[in-house]
């Protein structure tokens, strides 16, 4: 009987705290329906790796399953890149192609990344600061790739922060939007005219974006390339079954593995540190300033436009697709039930997906030596 319980002697309070954190993630996934495909495996994985002498992670010469998955899928950036194929297959760039000026909002909404880079550099070395700053894009795969390539010492905390803030978009964004806009601005109606987009344009778009991104930020080629490859599968018209597979089976399967593998970096000894709290705080700052950057850019444009834009659409310029666009539409209808700006918000949202990947590539170009 004593043998059965001797492992309890290896238990410490930090592990119990991580169980509670894992339980909180599972609660948010199930009860609040916040990114359940990610938060549930992350939460369960956090419990797995914080059991005393857990066989899920490498102990001495005994290799753990989650450690092997980490080496096979995250250490070489494979899981995030494969996930980008699925995300690309899900995205319809039609609203953006109908109104290309929306790309400007996606670019403006990356302001928080570079603001936080400057702030984080006061507390961390430049590579870690750059990795932390990318949390603001609300783009988990990009955060993982940038952190991994820059050999950040805080990969676990960065991954958890990036995906947690993605899930918390409906909670974080509305107060920021309301703080920066007036009721009159939030009730601005925007006329939407569906301009036809030819099949040729839809096919050429992912190819051209990949070429441009590769010339501007060569380090972003794998990120942009896999995203655009997924979109090309969607739009080419001859790979419908592959497109369906990429959107559903591939994306869901990789997301499950990604979520539980991220948890391998959530061991108590490495996670429960003051540095982690600071990273979570700086990641939140980056997220807030990304949202604010998009809104304030829209307000600036309104100073020069005859037909005003609803500044709330600027907040959709982060990479959290399609949550951010839906949040903006929900706020618009709350102020005025007849105000429908979903298509414009979606166009900005997909432009933010591209802009965040390119921003990540630019950061890699600056700091990867």
Label every PLM stretch briefly.
Residues 1-10, 31-32, 44-78, 232-255, ...:
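Hydrophobic transmembrane alpha-helices of multi-pass solute/ion transporters
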Residues 7-18, 67-83, 128-136, 218-228, ...:
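Structural signature of hydrophobic alpha-helical transmembrane segments
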Residues 31-39, 58-59, 66-70, 91-105, ...:
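Interfacial helix-loop-helix linkers and transmembrane-helix boundary segments
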Residues 71-76, 85-90, 104-111, 115, ...:
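Alpha-helical membrane segments and immediately flanking helix-loop junctions
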Residues 96-116, 268-294, 345, 349:
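Entry/N-cap segments of selected transmembrane alpha helices
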Residues 153-171, 282-288, 313-314:
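Alpha-helical transmembrane segments
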Residues 164-238:
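Membrane-embedded hairpin module used as a gating/binding unit in multi-pass transport
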Residues 209-297:
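Transmembrane helical segments that form the transport core of multi-pass membrane transport proteins
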């Amino acid at each position: 009987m004593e043998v059965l319980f001797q492992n309890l002697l290896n238990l410490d309070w930090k592990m119990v705290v991580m169980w509670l954190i894992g339980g909180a993630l599972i609660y948010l996934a199930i009860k609040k329906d916040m990114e359940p495909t990610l938060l549930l495996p992350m939460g369960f994985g956090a419990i797995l790796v914080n059991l005393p002498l857990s066989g899920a992670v490498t102990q001495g010469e005994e290799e753990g399953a989650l450690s092997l998955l980490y080496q096979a899928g995250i250490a070489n950036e494979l899981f995030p890149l494969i996930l980008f194929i699925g995300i690309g297959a899900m995205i319809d760039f039609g609203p953006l192609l109908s109104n290309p000026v929306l790309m400007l909002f996606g670019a403006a909404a990356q302001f928080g990344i570079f603001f936080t880079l400057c702030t984080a550099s006061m507390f961390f070395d430049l590579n870690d600061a750059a990795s932390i700053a990318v949390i603001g894009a609300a783009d988990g795969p990009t955060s993982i790739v940038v952190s991994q390539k820059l050999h950040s010492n805080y990969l676990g905390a960065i991954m958890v922060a990036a995906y947690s803030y993605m899930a918390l978009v409906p909670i974080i964004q509305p107060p920021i939007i309301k703080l920066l806009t007036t009721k009159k601005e939030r009730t601005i109606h925007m006329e939407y005219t569906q301009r036809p987009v030819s099949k040729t344009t839809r096919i050429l778009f992912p190819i051209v974006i990949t070429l441009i991104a590769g010339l501007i930020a060569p380090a972003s080629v794998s990120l942009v390339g896999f995203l655009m490859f997924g979109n090309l599968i969607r739009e080419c018209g001859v790979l419908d079954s592959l497109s369906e597979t990429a959107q559903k089976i591939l994306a869901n399967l990789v997301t499950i593995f990604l979520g539980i593998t991220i948890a391998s970096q959530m061991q108590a000894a490495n996670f429960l540190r003051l540095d982690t709290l600071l990273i979570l705080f700086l990641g939140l700052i980056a997220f807030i300033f990304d949202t604010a950057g998009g809104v304030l850019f829209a307000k600036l444009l309104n100073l020069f436009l005859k037909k005003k834009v609803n500044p709330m659409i600027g907040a959709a310029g982060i990479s959290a697709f399609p949550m951010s666009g839906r949040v903006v539409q929900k706020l618009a209808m709350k102020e005025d039930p007849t105000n429908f700006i979903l298509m414009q918000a979606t166009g900005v949202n997909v432009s933010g997906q591209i802009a965040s990947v390119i921003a990540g590539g630019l950061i890699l170009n600056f700091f990867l030596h």
